[in-house]
């Protein structure tokens, strides 16, 4: 079956037209969604930019614009309105050629594309193909965003547009980070390591280079806005806020007999051999006198190891110049595309879970909140002692929630299969806690012994909704599963009155109901029964004028009749009325326990616990159905909503047990009976 790209390309060829993307049109809102700039963008196709002679393409190049030139250096600049963090990420991607072709398919040209280009990006837990047309925003005839300086290669400008399309607009990229870019482009888990505070040592770098991860470093000194929006260079030639890739380490013996630890870095903006147009000017650079300290043999050996754009510097200079390392951990499948990673001895194995924080169901907030236990709970079973990298990614690019995660150890005697309850978290200290931040990604590196661990991904505040992906990478054996609560009845939610109470109006609750008998008899028929409309009148007359009065509505009355009517007459007796009223008082007592801050208003995230006290243990899916049916716009429930939910559940369980002929939690039901049961709820 042809892909969407193939269908569009075939259609454009048959009609001999250039494609216009209907999902990301050439309009102002595709550039700035929230802000309104004081000018209008003109959208131009790449070939039109070249034909206009306006200087929109590289002025110092006579070459015609192309999509991709494999021999060209990476010479992309952000333009007047582009983002330097994204340029840095694209520079790193371009230095990893096989991973580059995963994102930027090479079989595309400006001449044969008919205006449609495709890219592959890691988005919301999977690789997705993104299609864009080649209309780019310009100001006064010049490209407003990413553009080449001399090469006239436009893959970067079109890839930037594809990323903007995923985010909703170019403006949304203003809030992006290098971690976001590296994740989207490489599909890995990004971990930031401050070099000084993390006490980075040569051994740390060596261990990283034995695994399938890409190690980058950057000097994030405060940068000033440079001329022509070029990245700022430090006096030693190092670009500020640009990712340099760590290639290798080596030790060199000087003529004086001492050893110097060297670090090899790749300048992603250069593809020249060592000594030719090398930007780094410090010790061990081509013209440095430091080379006089080593023999010609050692010099030749070290230079032989350098690839295009690579250079040596001492480890001491490394930790002084660079302030942060950004490590991209890649799983085995992705790393196998890159030859230098494929041959490394340790490969990261990845397990992934995709979930959702849903208000009232799984959005419990961080461990500061009493609803923390309703968050998704993931069981990590570690077979071998090993390092693990845990990453939480929310599927929200604009206005992300504050997110993080907490982990607990589980050393119980039995294998955990159901969610841990609130008491567990009250009585146990967490094993680890990530930082919380309003970022798309939060990651944590830890060393775990063999055992079982429960991971709780959360938003910081309860009731905040978002989809998320949890990825866990390890070098050994481990399993990841989602814990779930089994749906069952723990207590009878609608107990019948004891026979003595029913006959003699015994007990305070029953006595208070018996006082309504005269009103009941006025409404009852000759058989002393009432229907839902008469029950409505009775409740209107009997219930006090507080929040319980809301239960006097026709919908609840219909539910009460359906719950207790076994004959199909649509009527109930006074004894059945008493049973309902006694249980209503009990339900109100439970409701009050969970609405102490504001009487009569139950926050949705407390519904699960309140229903558990009534007698229901419910799975996440069933809680989701209940919340969708009964939650109000402000994220709360009133007593009438709560009572309706309790009756609804009681009826559903009763209908199931009527059809259960011995099989555990399984029934076989005829279509007629199934429809009847559904309508009875």
Curated annotation (Swiss-Prot):
Keywords: Calcium, Cytoplasm, Metal-binding. Pfam families: Calpain_III, Peptidase_C2. Residues 515-681 are annotated as: Domain IV. Residues 552-587 form the EF-hand domain. It is found in: Cytoplasm. Its main location: cytoplasm. GO terms for molecular function: calcium ion binding. GO terms for cellular component: cytoplasm. Residues 18-331 form the Calpain catalytic domain. Gene3D superfamilies: 2.60.120.380, Cysteine proteinases (3.90.70.10), EF-hand (1.10.238.10). The keyword Metal-binding applies. Localized to the salivary glands in the larva. Residues 332-481 are annotated as: Domain III. Ca(2+) binds at residues 565, 567, 569, 571. InterPro entries: C2_III, Calpain_cysteine_protease, Calpain_domain_III, Calpain_III, Calpain_III_sf, EF-hand-dom_pair, EF_hand_dom, Papain-like_cys_pep_sf. Residues 482-514 are annotated as: Linker. Not known; does not seem to have protease activity. Although strongly related to peptidase C2 proteins, it lack the essential Cys, His and Asn residues of the catalytic triad at positions 84, 242 and 267, respectively. Belongs to the peptidase C2 family. This is Calpain-C. It comes from Drosophila melanogaster. The lineage of its organism: Eukaryota, Metazoa, Ecdysozoa, Arthropoda, Hexapoda. The gene is CalpC.
């Amino acid at each position: 079956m042809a892909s969407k790209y193939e269908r569009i390309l075939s259609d454009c060829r048959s009609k001999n037209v250039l494609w216009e993307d209907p999902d990301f049109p050439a309009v102002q809102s595709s550039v700035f969604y929230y802000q309104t700039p004081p000018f209008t963008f003109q959208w131009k196709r790449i070939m039109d930019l070249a034909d206009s002679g306006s200087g929109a393409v590289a002025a110092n190049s006579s070459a015609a614009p192309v999509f991709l030139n494999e021999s060209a250096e990476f010479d992309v600049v952000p333009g007047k309105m582009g983002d330097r963090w994204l340029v840095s990420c694209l520079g790193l991607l371009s230095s990893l050629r096989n991973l580059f072709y995963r994102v930027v398919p090479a079989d595309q040209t400006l001449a044969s594309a008919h205006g449609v280009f495709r890219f592959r990006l890691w988005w919301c837990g999977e690789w997705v193909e993104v299609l864009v047309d080649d209309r780019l925003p310009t100001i006064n005839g010049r490209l407003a965003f990413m553009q080449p300086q001399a090469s006239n290669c436009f893959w970067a400008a079109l890839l930037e547009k594809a990323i903007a399309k995923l985010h909703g607009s170019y403006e949304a990229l203003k809030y992006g980070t290098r971690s976001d870019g590296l994740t989207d482009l490489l599909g890995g888990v990004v971990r930031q390591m401050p070099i000084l505070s993390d006490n980075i040592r040569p051994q740390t770098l060596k261990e990283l280079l034995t695994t399938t991860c890409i190690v980058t470093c950057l000097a994030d000194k405060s940068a000033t806005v440079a001329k022509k929006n070029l990245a700022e260079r430090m006096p030693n030639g190092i670009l500020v806020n640009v990712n340099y890739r760590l290639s290798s380490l080596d030790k060199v013996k000087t003529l004086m007999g001492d050893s110097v630890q060297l670090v090899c870095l790749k300048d992603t903006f250069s593809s020249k051999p060592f000594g030719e147009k090398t930007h780094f000017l410090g010790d061990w650079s081509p013209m440095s006198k430091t080379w006089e300290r080593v023999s010609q043999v050692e010099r030749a050996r070290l230079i032989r190891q350098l690839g295009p754009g690579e250079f040596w510097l001492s480890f001491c200079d490394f930790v002084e110049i660079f302030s942060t390392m950004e490590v991209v951990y890649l799983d085995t499948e992705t790393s196998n595309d890159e030859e230098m990673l494929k041959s490394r001895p340790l490969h990261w194995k990845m397990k992934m879970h995709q979930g959702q924080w849903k208000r009232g169901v799984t959005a419990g907030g961080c461990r500061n909140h009493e609803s923390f236990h309703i968050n998704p709970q993931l069981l990590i079973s570690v077979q071998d002692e090993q390092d693990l990298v845990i990453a939480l990614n929310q599927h929200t690019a604009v206005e992300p929630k504050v997110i993080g995660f907490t982990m607990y150890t589980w050393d119980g005697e039995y294998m955990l299969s159901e969610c841990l309850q609130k008491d567990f978290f009250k009585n146990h200290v967490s094993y680890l806690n990530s930082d919380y931040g309003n970022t798309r990604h939060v990651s944590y590196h830890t060393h775990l012994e063999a055992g079982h661990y429960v991971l709780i991904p959360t938003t910081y505040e309860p009731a905040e909704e978002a989809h998320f992906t949890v990825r866990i990478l390890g070098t050994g054996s481990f399993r990841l599963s989602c814990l779930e609560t089994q749906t069952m009845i723990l207590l009878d939610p609608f107990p019948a009155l004891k026979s003595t109470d029913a006959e003699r109006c015994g007990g305070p609750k029953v006595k208070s109901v018996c006082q309504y008998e005269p009103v009941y008899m006025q409404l009852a028929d000759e058989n002393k029964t009432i229907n839902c409309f008469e029950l409505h009148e009775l409740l209107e007359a009997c219930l006090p004028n507080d929040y319980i009065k809301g239960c006097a509505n026709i919908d609840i009355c219909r539910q009460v009749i359906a719950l207790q009517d076994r004959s199909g007459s649509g009527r109930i007796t006074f004894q059945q009325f008493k049973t309902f009223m006694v249980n209503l008082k009990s339900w109100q007592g439970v409701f009050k326990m969970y609405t102490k801050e504001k009487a009569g208003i139950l926050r949705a995230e407390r519904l699960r616990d309140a229903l558990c006290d009534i007698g229901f243990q419910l799975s996440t899916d069933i809680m989701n159905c209940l919340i969708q049916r009964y939650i109000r716009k402000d994220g709360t429930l009133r007593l009438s909503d709560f009572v309706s939910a309790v009756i609804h559940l009681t009826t559903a369980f009763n209908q199931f047990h009527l059809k259960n002929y011995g099989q555990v939690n399984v029934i076989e039901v005829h279509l007629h009976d199934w429809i009847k049961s559904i309508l009875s709820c």
